[in-house]
Structure formats: structure tokens, C-alpha cells
């Protein structure tokens, strides 16, 4: 695996990750995102439907929490999770937790980390964790770590230090077992940067992890309360400054467009794409614009036709009918609202996705009101394609030195 930087502007990194995969013949552009999956499948979509989406990321994200209970089957199968789920040509990154449904805290010890599957808690020792990775055979995998000290709340120095010490101990043990494993010789371990909101421990974690032979870095614990955004961003800038430039930086729990841009400005390369799934589960469609070539005022009013109406929404409004506790954002419209009952426009005018070319807001509203499964399929197709297009626009903006304009455009669409 080789990371080639084409351009670095004010901390933003434009480039390619080359020689990926078991054969070393795959390339991924950065900044970019991973394909969010649940038990190895894109939510609501079949493999055939997924192929109809433009710009699908080259790396799919698996979550250990959803697969740990089934690793015996995969171990017996012996061909890895890619072949098992019918995606043998895809690249896979295995993370510990599902960013949409993180488990309860308080189950990390010096010898194990717990993940939460469909049947409850699964305790992971280092040996069990590496045995599961041998069964999955991912291209990349997040190392076992103590991620319970985050920036979302004040962390004591003692707890932050314990988090870093445990994570480094887990990393050394995993690296040793990887050396002894024939199956995992071509897999890459992603080291995890921990330390909560304690600057000293964050920097120690970054420096010590960088000394190990890891293939990249995962910035953990930077998701959380928007009220502490400035603290998180300051920590993030300091941490990325300690990391080598020739290895990719991933971040977990950050997926909203405005937060993505803030992290890119601080040197982050790869993000999770769970935000489109959350939007779909709310019965909503992404409608924010990211085309800097268009007149922003005209784009907001004409392309989507909803900006003036959406300004009046209460940002704290919950969409309880969907069973999703996430708050609605200004980047989406709620198609369950009655006003879309006779709206025969596409979700986004000019969008090239299958849903927008073939269906209307009124039709999606009808599907949602009648609880048709097709609603989730069509919304997921649109939301994924829209989100992947956003990352394409980020790379174009970096090429053309227009990232500041793109950021301004995104910020103008927020409440």
C-alpha cells in the first residue's frame, strides 16, 4: 500500500492510496469515504442495485459488532468475508463498532474489549479478535482499542492515560499475532489514536502508534457534542501534525457534510458514510447543494425548491415516526410531510441517480406513508449517490483551489 499526495493546501490532502487489495491493483482517491454496510451489505440494497449507484467507494466498511457472532461459519468457509457475501473483488475495512448503533460503555478491561451484536455482548480478547480477523480476511482492520475516553465529555487524565496504555498494549499484541499468522500477512492493521480530550495523552498516543508498523491511523473519539467542536478541532489539528504524511488517516463517527469539511482541513483522509443511512431511516432525502459552479442563491431556491421552507424548521425536531433518534439536519427534507403529497418534482433537480430520473417526491411520500420497502431502497440509492458526489466535489474543489467557496456554500445551507 502506498499513499501518494498530489497536493497539500492548508492541511487539506489530495491524493491517492495505491497498491491496495490482496493483488495490489486497486486505487482509492482521498479525501474520500468508505461504503457503509450492515453485516456486509449496503442497507436496503442488493448487489445489483448497488451497481446502479455512481461513485461507490472502493473500500467497504464491515463492523465487527455485526459479524462477530458468525465468525465460526466464516472460519469454516476459509475464503474470507468478501467471497462469502458475493463481493470477492471489493476491498474491506473492518471496524470494531457500528457508528449508527454504538454499544454501552463500561465493558473494557486491560485484557478485553466488548462489542454488541444481535444477541448481546461479545467479549473480545486479543486472541479471539485476531482469530475473527483470520476468518474475515479483510484488507484493513481497526486494531483492538479502548475507545471509551472521547472528546464528547470531560475525561480525567487518569482515564485518558489508561485508554492510551491499553490501546498500545492491544496494538503490540495484535501486531505480534499478525506476524505469526499466514492468513493475515497481506492485511493491514490500522492503529487507533485515543486519549479523550486530554492533549498530552492524545499526542502520546499519536507518537507511540506512529512508531509501530501500522498501515494507517484511525482517529477515535472525535465524534460527539457539537458544543465542544472547537476543542475537538484543536485536538484533531494537533494530533494529525504528529502523524507521518505517507499513511492514511481515517476518522470514525464523523459523517455530516459540514463536519467532514472541518476534518479535511485538519488532514483527515477517509470518512464513514453512515450519514446517508441515517437520513434514509428518517424518511428523508439529501438535498444540499455542493456545486460551486452554480449561483448559490439560484441553486438553493431552484434546484431543490425547499430552502425557504426548511429555514423555519426547528433543528431539534425529532422524527419519532421513523424510530430513529437522530435529529433532522438542514441538509435534508422530510418526505413524510404532507406538503410533498402532490409534489411531482424529483428529489433534487438535475440529480442523475436512478430515483430522481424515474420517480417524484410525491411517489416517495406515498411509499413512506404505506410503509413500502421500496421507499428505503429508492431513498438509499439517492442518498448514497448524493453523498458520494459530495466527496467528488471536495476533490475537485481541492484541485481547483475552491474549497473555501465549497465550505461557504455548505455553511450557508445550515440552520
From Swiss-Prot:
A biological process term (GO) from this entry: tRNA-guanine transglycosylation
Tissues expressed in: Expressed in brain, heart, kidney, liver, lung, skeletal muscle, spleen and testis.
Assigned GO CC terms: cytoplasm; cytoplasmic side of mitochondrial outer membrane; mitochondrion; protein-containing complex; tRNA-guanine transglycosylase complex
Binding positions (Zn(2+)): 351, 353, 356, 382
Cofactor(s) needed: Zn(2+)
Free-text comment on the cofactor: Binds 1 zinc ion per subunit.
Keywords: Cytoplasm, Membrane, Metal-binding, Mitochondrion, Mitochondrion outer membrane, tRNA processing, Zinc
Transferase recorded as keyword: no
Membrane topology summary: Peripheral membrane protein
Predominant localisation class: cytoplasm
The UniProt record lists the keyword Mitochondrion: yes
Disulfide bonds: none
Annotated localization: Cytoplasm; Mitochondrion outer membrane
Superkingdom to which the source organism belongs: Eukaryota
Gene Ontology molecular function: protein heterodimerization activity; protein homodimerization activity; tRNA binding; tRNA-guanosine(34) queuine transglycosylase activity; zinc ion binding
Pfam families linked to this entry: TGT
Quaternary organization: Heterodimer of a catalytic subunit QTRT1 and an accessory subunit QTRT2.
HAMAP family per record: QTRT2
NCBIfam families in alphabetical order: tgt_general
Family: Belongs to the queuine tRNA-ribosyltransferase family. QTRT2 subfamily.
Biological function: Non-catalytic subunit of the queuine tRNA-ribosyltransferase (TGT) that catalyzes the base-exchange of a guanine (G) residue with queuine (Q) at position 34 (anticodon wobble position) in tRNAs with GU(N) anticodons (tRNA-Asp, -Asn, -His and -Tyr), resulting in the hypermodified nucleoside queuosine (7-(((4,5-cis-dihydroxy-2-cyclopenten-1-yl)amino)methyl)-7-deazaguanosine).
Protein name: Queuine tRNA-ribosyltransferase accessory subunit 2
Organism in which the protein naturally occurs: Mus musculus (Mouse)
Gene behind the chain: Qtrt2
Amino acid at each position: 500500500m502506498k499513499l501518494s499526495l498530489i497536493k497539500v493546501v492548508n492541511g487539506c490532502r489530495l491524493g491517492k492510496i495505491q497498491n491496495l487489495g490482496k493483488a495490489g491493483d486497486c486505487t482509492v482517491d482521498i479525501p474520500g469515504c468508505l461504503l457503509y454496510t450492515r453485516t456486509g451489505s449496503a442497507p436496503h440494497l442488493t448487489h445489483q442495485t448497488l451497481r446502479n449507484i455512481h461513485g461507490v467507494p472502493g473500500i467497504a466498511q464491515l463492523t465487527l459488532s455485526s459479524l462477530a457472532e458468525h465468525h465460526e461459519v466464516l472460519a469454516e468457509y476459509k475464503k474470507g468475508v468478501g467471497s462469502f457475501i458475493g463481493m470477492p473483488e471489493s476491498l474491506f475495512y473492518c471496524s470494531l463498532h457500528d457508528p449508527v448503533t454504538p454499544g454501552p460503555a463500561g465493558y473494557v478491561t486491560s485484557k478485553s474489549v466488548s462489542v454488541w451484536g444481535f444477541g448481546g455482548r461479545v467479549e473480545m480478547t486479543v486472541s479471539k479478535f485476531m482469530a475473527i480477523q483470520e476468518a474475515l480476511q479483510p484488507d484493513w482492520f481497526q486494531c483492538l482499542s479502548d475507545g471509551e475516553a472521547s472528546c464528547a465529555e470531560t475525561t480525567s487524565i487518569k482515564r485518558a492515560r489508561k485508554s492510551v496504555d491499553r490501546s498500545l498494549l492491544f496494538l503490540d499484541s495484535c501486531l505480534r499475532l499478525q506476524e505469526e499468522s499466514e492468513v493475515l500477512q497481506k492485511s493491514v492493521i490500522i492503529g487507533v489514536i485515543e486519549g479523550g480530550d486530554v492533549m498530552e495523552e492524545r499526542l502520546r498516543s499519536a507518537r507511540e502508534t506512529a512508531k509501530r508498523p501500522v498501515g494507517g491511523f484511525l482517529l477515535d473519539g472525535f465524534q460527539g457534542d457539537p458544543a465542544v467542536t472547537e476543542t475537538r478541532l484543536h485536538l484533531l489539528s494537533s494530533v494529525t501534525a504528529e502523524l507521518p504524511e505517507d499513511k492514511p488517516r481515517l476518522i470514525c463517527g464523523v459523517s455530516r457534510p459540514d463536519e467532514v469539511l472541518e476534518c479535511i482541513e485538519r488532514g483527515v483522509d477517509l470518512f464513514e458514510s453512515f450519514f446517508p443511512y441515517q437520513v434514509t431511516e428518517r424518511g428523508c432525502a439529501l438535498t444540499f447543494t455542493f456545486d460551486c459552479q452554480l449561483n448559490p442563491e439560484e441553486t438553493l431556491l431552484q434546484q431543490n425548491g425547499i430552502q425557504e421552507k426548511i429555514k423555519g424548521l426547528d433543528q431539534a425536531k425529532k422524527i419519532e415516526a421513523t424510530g430513529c433518534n437522530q435529529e433532522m439536519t438542514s441538509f435534508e427534507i422530510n418526505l413524510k410531510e404532507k406538503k410533498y403529497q402532490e409534489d411531482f418534482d424529483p428529489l433534487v433537480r438535475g440529480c442523475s441517480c436512478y430515483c430522481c430520473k424515474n420517480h417524484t417526491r410525491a411517489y416517495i411520500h406515498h411509499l413512506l406513508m404505506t410503509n413500502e420497502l421500496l421507499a428505503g431502497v429508492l431513498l438509499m440509492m439517492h442518498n448514497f449517490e448524493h453523498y458520494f458526489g459530495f466527496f467528488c466535489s471536495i476533490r475537485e474543489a481541492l484541485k481547483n483551489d475552491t474549497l473555501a467557496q465549497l465550505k461557504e456554500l455548505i455553511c450557508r445551507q445550515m440552520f
